[in-house]
Every structure is written in structure tokens, then in C-alpha cells.
């Protein structure tokens, strides 16, 4: 009851904000994968010309999204009436204050059918980006078609839309009613694409962005994995559509970096290459991360894979598919964390001939992984799993060459660290 009251008040304040600030543009980022990286890349490029508001935290729900749009931090005591009264006061101040931003870039997250319709009640998007339609929250959605209907609704509720051609099946195009839709992807025939000319671990990808408005734009982007280029492609496309020059886009491009826990390359023990993709996991994202690991030139490669949560009835099949992707000619070890990977992924990987070791929780895996890295100097090791109950970033922390790199890991706030301490304490108690 109280949550519903807060939500309705926040939605009304957002409506009032855009009435009071008609020149402020709202860009929404939806999709099954890569929303945060796409949002961050868009903000980096647009900042070269415009005043941009973007909350890097995962503020994408019915309560947190309005807060991010208004530029207000979530209160520490979310059940306190007085804390929310203070939030409402700040919201009124935002409405009354002259424009301090030109563009707001907002992530729109959906967990179930109807979530996007809730956003549509009070948001009028000038532009929408849909990053992909892949299995997510299948316990709630049931089918991929339901996921598509939900995510593509963002495109239909916007003035114009950009669709990731690589990660959205062409069969779902019939769901689009918006006539002003463009596509982006790693390859042509997407209207916005990228031609890779070179890759370097330090510098990233060098090549040419192919655009409608500005032709080819040469550039270098410090990201890892060709699928990590897609958020930058979306950002370049948005920059073009927002009237930026080639020089402005190139300048913004130089600032783009991987977001914490999203294909971030770090130095590890024994000269190892740590590929930190621990923020979350889904079948499409994990598949792309594995393919990227296979492309790394290293004496050996190791995959540390945690459960993919909220897969519902699809969990067995999706985990098994990933297990079948595990190639013994490419991987010296497949190390799993969690019950679903042990039950479904590990047997499939073993059947293919992979060396597999399973662990109930992340911290239990640490001594074994350290031992492997001591024996396999210079290995490339991928870490990827869902956040709830997996927390593979805590394993990465123990593998870092320098403790200074802890700042680059995901979920390191005091609140998150307390949550993880309590979780691992419960796991330890259950084992005793």
C-alpha cells in the first residue's frame, strides 16, 4: 500500500517535471542485455555537446526509475514516511528549478508482463533504444515472445527508436508499430555498424563506425569483446540523431570505458588475464562472453561460470546449452558455482570432454582457482554469473594482481558488502 502511494507520487512528479521542462529530452534504454553499458556509453558521447543526466546505478524499477529521472538519490530508510517526505520536497524543487540538463538517459527494466506499460503511463520518450530480446526472467515471462512484446513496447512508445539488429530476431519486427525505427549492429545491413580493423588489449578496438548522417567515423574504443561494441554503436547512433558532429562523437568515444562487472579486463595473479563479467548473467550474454574468451590468445583459458537466475522452466535447457558450448580444446577448466550449473551445465561440459569442478558457493571456489592459476601462469579466466546468491566479483577480488583494482569491481558499496557478508555467513552455517 505504502509502496503504491510512493510510486504514484513519483510518477506524478515526473509528469510535472516534463511539463515544466518541455525542452528536456528523454531517452529510454530497454532490452534483455547490455542496458547499463548502453546507457553509460550514450551519456559519455552526448556529454561532449549536451548537459546529460544519467544514473549509473541500476535504477530501473517502478520506484528507482522516477528517482533517477529527477536526479534524486534513493533514501537509506525506504520504509520511512519522513524519508520519502524529504524526497517529495526535493522533487518539487526539481520541478521549479530552471533547466539544468538537456537530455536525460534512463534505463527501463522489466521483470514481468506489464512493467513497460507502467512506464508508458507517465513517460513520453523522445527516443528509445532496445538492446536485445533474449531469455530473461523466464519464471515470469514464460516465453521469448512475451519478452519481445514487453521490451519492444519501449520502441513503440517513443518518438523514434534504435533496435539492436544482432540480438533481436527479425520475426519480432511485426510487433513494431513505430514507423521511425533504425537498426544498429556489428555488421551491415544494420544502418549503424562497426568495421573492425585492429584489436589490442590496451587500446581496444580500432575501426570505422558506419553511420547514416556522417558516413564513416574512424575511432578507437577501449572495450573487450565484439558484443561490447554494441553499446558504443548505439551511443554513436544516438549522437548522430541528436545532431552531433563527427569531432564531437570522436571526442566522446575516447571516454567510453567498460562499466564495472561488464567485460572489464584486469590483471590477475600469475600474470593471468581476468575477464570480469560478474554483474549479471543470461544465456545470450554468457554465450557471447564464452566466444570472446575463446578468441583470447593465452597459454590456457578457464571459465568460471555461476548460475543464471530466474530462468524458470527454461533453466535446465539454457544451462545445458552453455555446457555444450564449453570446448575442451579451448578450455583447461570449467569451474561452476551454484546448484543449477552443477546440475545441468557441468554434465554437458563433461560429456564434451572438459575438465570440470563444481562448487556450492563462490568463496569455496577461491582456493582451487588460486591453485590453478599458480600452475597455469598467464591464463585467461572468465568470471560470469548472476548477482543474487552468486557474487563472483568476490572471487575476482582474491585473484587481482593489485588491490588498487578493487575499485573497478561491481557491488562494493557498504550496503552491498554487508549483504554479501550475511549471505556467505548463512552459507557457511548451512555447511557446518
List each model region and its residues:
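ATP-dependent carboxylate-amine ligase catalytic core
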Residues: 15-21, 47-149, 248
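Short glycine-/acidic-enriched loop or helix-start segments at secondary-structure transitions
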Residues: 38-39, 64, 115-116, 139-140, ...
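ATP-dependent carboxylate-amine ligase
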Residues: 1-11, 177-178, 214, 237-432
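Short beta-strand segments
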Residues: 28-30, 107, 131-132, 164, ...
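Short, basic phosphate-binding NTP loop
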Residues: 1-30, 37-44, 48-49, 63, ...
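Conserved adenylation A10 loop of the ANL superfamily
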Residues: 29-38, 235, 385-387
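Short beta->alpha connector loops
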Residues: 109-113, 167-168, 280-281, 362-364
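Acidic, Mg2+-coordinating active-site environments of NTP-dependent enzymes
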Residues: 24, 100, 112, 120-121, ...
Amino acid at each position: 500500500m505504502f509502496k503504491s502511494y510512493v510510486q504514484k507520487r513519483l510518477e506524478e512528479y515526473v509528469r510535472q517535471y516534463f511539463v515544466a521542462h518541455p525542452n528536456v529530452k528523454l531517452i529510454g534504454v530497454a532490452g534483455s542485455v547490455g542496458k547499463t553499458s548502453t546507457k553509460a556509453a550514450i551519456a559519455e558521447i552526448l556529454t561532449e555537446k549536451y548537459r546529460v543526466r544519467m544514473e549509473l546505478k541500476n535504477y530501473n524499477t517502478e520506484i528507482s526509475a522516477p528517482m533517477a529521472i529527477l536526479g534524486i538519490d534513493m533514501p537509506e530508510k525506504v520504509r520511512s514516511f519522513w524519508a520519502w517526505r524529504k524526497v517529495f520536497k526535493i522533487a518539487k524543487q526539481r520541478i521549479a528549478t530552471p533547466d539544468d540538463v538537456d537530455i536525460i538517459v534512463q534505463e527501463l527494466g522489466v521483470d514481468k508482463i506489464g512493467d513497460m506499460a507502467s512506464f508508458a503511463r507517465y513517460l513520453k520518450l523522445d527516443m528509445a533504444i532496445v538492446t536485445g530480446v533474449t531469455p530473461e526472467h523466464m519464471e515470469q515471462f514464460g516465453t521469448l515472445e512475451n519478452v519481445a512484446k514487453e521490451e519492444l513496447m519501449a520502441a513503440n512508445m517513443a518518438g523514434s527508436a534504435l533496435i539492436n539488429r544482432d540480438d533481436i530476431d527479425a520475426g519480432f519486427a511485426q510487433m513494431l508499430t513505430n514507423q521511425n525505427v533504425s537498426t544498429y549492429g556489428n555488421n551491415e545491413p544494420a544502418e549503424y555498424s562497426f568495421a573492425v580493423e585492429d584489436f589490442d588489449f590496451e587500446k581496444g578496438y580500432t575501426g570505422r563506425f558506419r553511420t547514416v548522417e556522417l558516413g564513416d567515423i574512424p575511432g578507437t574504443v577501449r572495450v573487450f569483446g565484439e558484443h561490447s561494441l554494441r553499446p558504443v554503436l548505439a551511443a554513436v547512433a544516438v549522437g548522430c540523431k541528436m545532431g552531433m558532429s563527427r569531432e564531437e562523437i570522436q571526442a566522446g568515444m575516447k571516454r567510453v570505458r567498460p562499466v564495472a562487472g561488464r567485460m572489464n579486463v584486469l590483471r590477475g595473479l600469475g600474470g593471468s588475464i581476468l575477464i570480469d563479467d560478474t554483474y549479471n548473467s543470461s544465456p545470450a550474454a554468457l554465450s557471447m562472453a564464452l566466444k570472446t574468451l575463446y578468441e583470447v590468445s593465452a597459454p590456457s583459458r578457464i571459465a568460471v561460470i555461476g548460475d543464471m537466475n530466474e530462468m524458470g522452466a527454461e533453466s535446465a535447457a539454457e544451462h545445458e546449452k552453455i555446457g555444450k558450448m564449453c570446448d575442451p580444446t579451448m578450455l583447461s577448466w570449467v569451474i561452476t558455482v551454484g546448484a543449477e550449473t552443477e546440475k545441468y551445465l557441468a554434465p554437458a561440459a563433461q560429456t564434451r570432454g572438459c575438465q570440470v569442478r563444481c562448487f556450492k558457493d563462490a568463496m569455496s571456489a577461491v582456493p582451487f582457482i588460486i591453485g590453478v592459476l599458480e600452475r597455469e601462469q598467464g591464463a585467461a579466466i572468465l568470471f560470469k554469473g548472476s548477482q543474487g546468491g552468486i557474487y563472483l566479483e568476490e572471487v575476482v577480488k582474491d585473484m587481482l594482481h593489485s588491490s588498487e583494482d578493487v575499485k573497478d569491481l561491481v557491488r562494493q558499496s557498504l550496503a552491498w558488502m554487508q549483504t554479501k557478508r550475511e549471505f556467505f555467513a548463512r552459507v557457511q552455517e548451512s555447511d557446518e
